[in-house]
Amino acid sequence: MAPGVARGPTPYWRLRLGGAALLLLLIPVAAAQEPPGAACSQNTNKTCEECLKNVSCLWCNTNKACLDYPVTSVLPPASLCKLSSARWGVCWVNFEALIITMSVVGGTLLLGIAICCCCCCRRKRSRKPDRSEEKAMREREERRIRQEERRAEMKTRHDEIRKKYGLFKEENPYARFENN
């Protein structure tokens, strides 16, 4: 199609075909996951991997129990399962290690961001003066130039007055006085 040529509205059958293709792509993805309503207790005394296929389940290593994750609290309570033996998401990381790792990574990221912000601000400040400093320097320079112009005008006016009244200073006021 040539550039600049307007296209008409999309035919209705194309919209239906696109919607059907999207639906066909999403069905296998939805079928692979266990529904969140499936009881986690069905996977008790099985493997950790089978339990954690459902994202709403928590695996307790001490008693090989698959439990519903307590969504009301961020961390599972100790009465449910100790943090050192609780697994969620992946089987090879317990909750204690996960919490410590996430804290260290989060703290490192925050510290890195803070350091980057400080360095950028310092570099920006040292690189060029800000607008108020530039304005103050410009005004100071303008005042100095006006003052020099006024001094030059005053000097010429004073010289004219001295010439008028014969008080003009000589080139060398300390010339030797000669009597002839």
UniProtKB/Swiss-Prot annotation:
Localisation per UniProt entry: Membrane; Cytoplasm; Nucleus
Entry keyword Cytoplasm: yes
Principal location listed in the UniProt entry: membrane
Coiled-coil stretches: 130-165
Keywords noted in UniProt: Coiled coil, Cytoplasm, Glycoprotein, Membrane, Nucleus, Phosphoprotein, Signal, Transmembrane, Transmembrane helix
Extracellular membrane side: 33-96
Residues where Phosphotyrosine is found: 174
Membrane-spanning segments: 97-117
SMART domains referenced in this protein's UniProt entry, alphabetically: PSI (SM00423)
Residue ranges annotated for the PSI domain, each copy included: 39-92
Keyword Aminoacyl-tRNA synthetase: no
Name of protein: Pituitary tumor-transforming gene 1 protein-interacting protein
The encoding gene: PTTG1IP
